[in-house]
Regions:
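Hydrophobic/aromatic anchor residues within beta-strands of the central parallel beta-sheet
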Residues: 57, 97, 160-163
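Strand-loop microenvironment adjacent to phosphate/nucleotide-handling motifs in alpha/beta enzyme folds
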Residues: 4, 114, 148-327
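Conserved Rossmann-fold cofactor-binding substructure of NAD(P)-dependent oxidoreductases
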Residues: 56-77
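N-terminal Rossmann NAD(P)H-binding glycine-rich loop of SDR-like oxidoreductase domains
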Residues: 6-26
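Conserved residues in the N-terminal Rossmann fold of short-chain dehydrogenase/reductase
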Residues: 37, 58-59, 99, 248
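Rossmann-fold scaffold of SDR-type NAD(P)-dependent oxidoreductases
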Residues: 10, 72-81, 122
Length: 327
């Protein structure tokens, strides 16, 4: 699908962007890959690793609509991965988070439509479902913008979809590097907020594969949600440092005990497939039948009141499995 195509990824110097580009170069022969991001040092460092002739590096901010439009000239596919995602920072700097995560999303949409991009996938988070913090609220707003964008295109070909998933193993700012840093610096205990806390858990490679697949599946307007395992944070602490005691410090503002991917309030718009769910748009877009996707896979409506959260997930990782995922 990506052979001889031009792909742009916003926030391309992040954990997801690096893995996405690595796998893209391994599997396909793209015409051009454009990394669009703000930090020239990260781009310089990335160029040392990814220096294939097809690579291009654009310094720019998703807040800058004109720069985005220049970057998307003759682009076929866009992955929107740029975001401010640190929950405490978003609470303290709310307008900065809104400018990047909401206004930036609309700028990506406008540029993609103006440039005739074929397909756009925006990355989302489980924190966008029933959000209780500003970061989650901005990502929910972004999801709504990308879904509604399919009604803005008229007779043009541009299509938009969203991929929502949970915590990515070892990503920047996540709990794994936090725990490992404590251990490396001689910590005598590991802090967790609540022994009951659970999270969805995803390997970065699986997240990239899910995005690849959904470029094929998408018709426009879907929120794609993978069926992935959950983990107990207390088990993760045991996997990383089994010899250290655990200190319960209390839940932080903006945290949930369990994260939600498919809210029960949207069960009537949720379709289950073999390895994923799809939340359909709440209004008709092009009269698509979302129970059959673009590659012919068939799904079925979920039961009344269905919700998919990290606490009721039938698949939990064991301490041993977590240790293998976090060597």
């Amino acid at each position: 699908m990506f052979n001889n195509k031009t792909i742009l990824i916003t926030g391309g110097t992040g954990s997801f962007g690096k893995k996405f580009i690595s796998m893209l170069l391994d599997r396909y022969r793209p015409k051009k890959i454009i990394v669009y991001s703000r930090d020239e040092l990260k781009q310089f460092e990335m160029q040392q690793k990814f220096n294939a002739p097809c690579m291009r590096y654009f310094i720019g901010d998703v807040r800058d609509g004109a720069r985005l439009e220049k970057a998307m000239y003759k682009v076929d596919y866009v992955v929107h991965a740029a975001a401010l995602k640190q929950v405490p920072a978003a609470e303290y700097n709310p307008m900065e988070c809104i400018m990047t995560n909401v206004h930036g999303a609309q700028n990506v949409i406008n540029a993609a439509i103006a440039c005739g991009v074929k397909k756009v996938i925006a990355l989302s988070t489980d924190k966008a479902a029933n959000p209780i913090n500003l970061y989650g609220a901005t990502k929910l707003c972004s999801d709504k913008l990308f879904t509604a964008a399919n009604a803005m295109v008229g007779d043009r070909e541009t299509r938009f979809a969203v991929v929502r998933y949970g915590n990515v193993v070892g990503s920047r700012g996540s709990v794994v590097p936090f725990f490992k840093n404590l251990v490396a610096n001689g910590a005598t205990e590991l802090p967790i907020t609540d022994e009951r806390m659970t999270r969805f858990w995803l390997k970065l490679e699986d997240g990239v594969n899910f995005v690849f697949k959904n470029f094929e599946r998408m018709q426009g307007g879907e929120i794609f949600i993978p069926k992935i395992p959950s983990m107990r944070v207390v088990d993760l602490a045991k996997a990383i440092a089994p010899e250290l005691p655990i200190k319960v410090i209390g839940i932080r503002p903006g945290e949930k005990l369990h994260e939600v991917m498919c809210p029960s309030d949207l069960y009537y718009d949720t379709i289950e497939f073999d390895d994923h769910f799809v939340i359909m748009p709440s209004f008709d877009i092009k009269k698509y039948d979302y129970t059959t996707n673009a590659i012919g896979e068939k799904g079925k409506p979920v039961p009344d009141g269905f919700d998919y959260n990290s606490g009721n997930n039938p698949h939990f990782l064991t301490v041993e499995e977590l240790r293998e995922m976090n060597p």
